Amino acid sequence: MKKNFIIIFFTIIFCSSASADKLLKNGFINNNMNYAELQKVNDPKNKIILIYNHGQDTHDAASKNCLWKNGVRNMASLVGEKVNEKEIMVYIFCTDHLAGDDKRLWKKKKFKPPYKGVTKLEKRLNANLELIDKFVSMGTPNKQIIIMGQSCGGWMSLMLASRYLEKIGGVITTMPACYGEITRDFKVKKRGIEKALEKFRKKEGDGPADLREKQINEIKQSNNLPVLVFTHPMDPYEGLLSDWVEEIPGVQRIIISEDLKINGKKCKRIGINNGKKWSEPVKNAHYIIMGDCFQYYNPVILEYIASRTK
């Protein structure tokens, strides 16, 4: 897989961060973007658990990363909120250590379809199913478990919902993507979707193109998919390729904005580096969900959660 196709989720290029500024293990978080002191689910019947799935450093290979604190600021703001008289908890689920079985996928000259074995996305999906079963066995009803995901985590979440909707209350996905910066690199705005995808297939090979198409078609076969999807036309990944989600009955799609503002407010990423707060303007729409401005959509998210957990 070429470097320019690496799906980077929470890489902060401009700074070097202490390990304490990263979230590298599974667990519940609090409003301060730290791991909660209590990692148990007390009174599980009156809790709503949001399982948050990060993006990926690479499409099919393993990584030691998970996410950065600045990336969960908006998710952390939901912790403790009451919906239908039930309290929200947010669980960070780190699965980037998983690897697909056929890593030749992005090596055009070496890969011979079909994909042999289980992809990283499928392994992440299966890991989520195991985690869901764990929480259910502890007493949390299936409908009170919501899957959340960004980028590759969001793409995987849509796959999960299309197959196992009965196991969860719903899905909230932001910038679902996992096949590189197709919108930007293949000039979707200039060429149009069809020609851009032809260029993508020609350059990267049938392996990635076929797998992407297969996964989209599977998701689109859903008769009803009551999920909440956030996209942005300036997202260099799937930004101008996301209209297909509206073909699925039940999908609630939110186009975040047409620029790098939300409701007229400029978006800033606010994080912690070596114990000190920092901020910078959001420059890439793929990461606008990390901006402080994204909390404008908290009422929409809470309304969706309420509709799926009543």
Q: Can you say where each PLM-predicted feature lies in the sequence?
A:
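Conserved alpha/beta-hydrolase
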Residues: 76-107
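N-terminal cap/lid segment of alpha/beta-hydrolase-fold proteins
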Residues: 21-43
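Alpha/beta-hydrolase active-site loop
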Residues: 104-139
